[in-house]
Every structure is written in C-alpha cells, then in structure tokens.
Amino acid sequence: MNENISADKIRLLAGVRRIVVHPGLAHVDDIMSCAMAYAFGVRHDAVIERRRPEPADLDDLETLVMDVGFALDPARLDFDHHQRSRDEPPRCAYALFAEWLGVDEEMRRLFPWYETWNAIDTLGAHATALKLGTTGDAIAGLVAHPLGEWVIRHFADNPEFRARVALGLGKEIDKTRRSWESLREKTKTLDVAGLPVADFRDCPADEISRCSDIWIRLHRPACIVCYDNRGSGLTLLRCNDDVRLDFHRCAGRPYALFAHPGGFVLKTQTRDDDLKAILADARTDRT
C-alpha cells in the first residue's frame, strides 16, 4: 500500500525507535500523528514518549518528533506546527507528516475526520464551525463526545493504553486504505429505473462498512445495494437524501422485509428480488 512513498522515506521511518509527542492534555492531533506513523511504516515496537524533546531528539533520526518541538524539518523527522505563522496554510502535525509522505490528498479523500480535525487543531473549534457555516455550540457535542474524551484522557495517562490505541488506529487506517482499493475494483455503477445505483454485491461486508461512505461522497449515487448482512435478502440504502427515492413506498410489497418509516432503508426477502421493480416502486415522481 505504500508503494507511492519513496524508498528513502520508508527507510527513515523503519529506523524510528521512539515517537515523541507533547506532555499534558492529549489531543486528536498527537494521537492521530502516532497512529499515522505506525500506519505508514514506523515499527510497531517504537515507544511513544510524552515529553518535551531535547535538542538531541530533534537531530536523532531514530526519534520521530510530532506536534511538539517548534521545528518542521522532515529530513530530521521533526513535525511540529506551533511555530508556523498565521499567514501559512493551517496544517496540524499529522497533516504535515502526510504532506511529506505524499499521502495528504489520499487521506483527505478517504477519511472525513482528517480535514475537520486539522482545522479544529489549527484554527480552533469556533473558527472551524464558522468555516463550516455553523456555530461552535452546534458542533460542541461532536468535538467533545464521550468516547473521544475518554480515549484522550487515557491516552495521556496510561502508557499501555496509549500504545494499543495508536497501534489500533494505525491498523484501521491501513485496513481502510486496502479496503478502498479492493472496493473500487469490485463496485459496479448501474442505471436502474433511471437512477444511478452503486452495486456493492461483490464486496465483503467489512469493505462496505469501511468504505461505502467514501464511494457515496465521491460518486453521489441515488442509492446503494448490497447483500443484507443480517438476513437472506438485499439491503438498499438511499444516499444523500435523494428526493427521488422513498423506500417506505415499498412497505407491504411481497418483496419487502422491512421498509424504514424514514424512507432511507429497505430490506428485501431474497437476493433474487427484482431491483428494477423495487426502485420503480420507490420513485417519488412516479405513481
């Protein structure tokens, strides 16, 4: 998966023995910086140290310094952003690391959190909310949600948990990147009843759960179809609240196992149910 990263950079990362991030309260930036380091080639037994780097650390190619140190020097594996001026593009530590690797565009495409948390870390939650066309109060529950807050506190306080979280998140990044490449090859785009449909029936459930949202964002289908992972039929999911589809219109049809009252999900009785007939029934512009 890292074939587009230069051999010199891969060798540099393979030699890293420790990752130094800032002490005190942890943030998404330093946690995901560690995760991305593991995902893109740092050996999994490299220890995470939460402390201020010494001058020798900034020169040591066995030490990857992330989000601390007031230095951006990729050749020495130093990736901090706190010394950058307001006139420079807002880039947190993990974004600077990704730019150096040449995977910044890929990360933006595959992971919605990537750009949002880059903005929150560099601009602040209030300015990010304004950038998104809303208010700080409106996104407060997303920024400070209970799972994230719990992980952040324990990442700061528990070295064993810290390593497990960073390694686990790094593996998730790697799995999603691999799953996306596989899903791209297997997904078919169909024209059914005059609607663009993403057909995921050749894709394993894990690939769909990881990557279907990516496909939807990039290709904007009216709906997706896949095999029901809880039953013996099909699952159809309306995308982007497409006004042309309301699957609740299918309720009571012989093929319908479950039609969500909200109109965005339909589960069918069998895998052989007629997709064209189903979508024709669900069209809101047809009687």
Language-model features, listed with the residues they occupy:
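Active-site rim beta-loop-alpha module in soluble metabolic enzymes
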Residues: I152-I216
